[in-house]
Design a protein with these regions (language model features):
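Fe-S-dependent hydro-lyases/dehydratases of central metabolism
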Residues: 1-417
Length: 417
């Protein structure tokens, strides 16, 4: 009667399991970004000469690319040297994209595997049916050395989303509605399984939004069941071997929640927490100085298409800066071929190279004190995108695009008629 989390961990450990047990699992893929520099330090302290498997470690530069400080440059150099010395096969330098997007594009995110990453939003790969979760640098050093990791088998909650998404409502609105309902710790150390008509109809890109943001309600892992769409994506990506793992018919869930997508409105997460969710009507008219469309949450092609639909033939308000950051160079080039980048430039937007910069307040558009931003990213904690005296609202790409035009938070639906 296993849940999806239990079934995958059983496969990875060779034991039969139930929630609450401690298990040692074999890791399929271990991903790090620039914080690999820290992992290297701990790995050397363990005293191992070689990593357990140089074809199962993936390193992707994305947080501060190209390097914005001497400290970052030194860290990146240290990692490049380690990659060379260990013969790590899958190393993606500053010209690839954001780690969670790259894992998907290169066929690493796939059903039935255990995937760990030194980034909290590693849960994104759950959209493909992977047991994917974030771990710390010391923990990752242990994985690099042994290829194994211990977990407490999480309990599972099931979230059913039925109905149809109306015009102007996107996966981002769905998950923010859910987080607003469950709260920031509503799924603490739990596995989440998403099901229902609305989820089945979603594209892979939209499903990634759900799994990505589930971290913001405390989820350990967040699954969308793999299906034909998943299979098609993986075939196109020449993915590594995988098998579809699903929950058993009568799996035990600690809780089940039901939502109706047809009743959902565009929503915005207000400062300074992701569960401070309000309907667009409640926050319409709040002045903004910056609008950001991009990140591992909403920087994919479908997101940029929606933003371009709204921005086409219109101008960003003079008092507002619009920054666009595609999630990867693959997305960037697709957007370029489709003429989307032209639309953004024509509207007065600034396009940055793929990376995490603005989302974590590292570079490429940091907020000053007293400034307000609306962003498609996944966190709005105090000081997240710059000054501790700045304010961040989170919304869908359509809502952010509409707000950039007006210089204040705006309902995207009036631009989609």
């Amino acid at each position: 009667l296993g849940t999806l989390a239990e079934n995958i961990l059983e496969e990875a450990s060779g034991k039969s399991l139930t929630a609450g047990e401690i298990v040692y699992a074999n890791v399929d893929t271990a991903m790090s970004h620039e914080n690999a520099a820290l992992v290297i330090r701990w790995f050397k302290e363990i005293g191992r000469e070689r990593v357990w498997n140089n074809e199962r470690i993936v390193i992707i530069f994305d947080h501060r690319v190209p390097a914005e400080s001497i400290k970052t440059a030194e860290g990146q150099k240290k990692i490049r040297n380690f990659v060379k010395e260990q013969g790590i096969k899958y190393f993606y330098d500053i010209n690839t994209g954001i780690c969670h997007q790259v894992l998907a594009e290169k066929g690493f995110s796939r059903p039935g595997i255990v995937l760990v990453g030194t980034d909290s939003h590693t849960t994104t790969a759950g959209a493909f049916g992977a047991f994917a979760t974030g771990i710390g640098a010391t923990e990752m050093a242990g994985v690099w050395a042994t290829g194994k990791i211990w977990f407490k088998v999480p309990e599972t909650i099931k979230i059913n989303v039925e109905g149809e998404l109306n015009k102007g409502i996107y996966a981002k609105d769905v998950i923010l509605n859910i987080i607003g309902h469950l709260g920031a710790d509503g799924a603490n150390y739990m596995a989440v399984e998403f099901d229902g008509e609305a989820i089945k109809k979603m594209s892979i890109a939209s499903r990634m939004v759900l799994s990505n943001l589930s971290m913001e309600m405390g989820a350990k892992v967040a699954f969308v069941y793999p299906d034909e769409k998943t299979r098609k994506w993986l075939e196109e990506r020449e993915a590594k071997p995988y098998k579809f793992v699903l929950p058993d018919k009568n799996a035990r869930y600690v809780d089940e929640y039901n939502f109706n997508a047809s009743e959902m409105q565009p929503v915005v997460a207000c400062p300074h927490s992701v569960d401070n969710v309000k309907s667009i009507e409640e926050v319409e008219g709040v002045e903004i100085q910056q609008a950001f469309i991009g990140s591992c949450t909403n920087g994919r092609l479908e997101d940029l298409r929606e933003a371009a639909r709204i921005l086409k033939g219109r101008k960003v308000r003079k008092s507002t800066r619009l920054i666009i950051g595609p999630a990867s160079w693959e997305v960037y080039r697709d957007a370029m071929r489709e003429g989307l980048l032209d639309i953004f430039i024509e509207a007065g937007g600034v396009i940055i190279n793929p990376g995490c910069g603005p989302c974590l307040g590292a570079h490429q558009g940091i907020l000053a004190s007293g400034e307000t931003a609306i962003s498609t990213t996944n966190r709005n904690f105090q000081g997240r995108m710059g000054s501790p005296e700045s304010f961040v609202y989170l919304a869908s790409p359509a809502t952010v695009a509409a707000s950039a035009i007006e210089g204040k938070i705006a309902d995207p639906r009036k631009y989609l008629r």
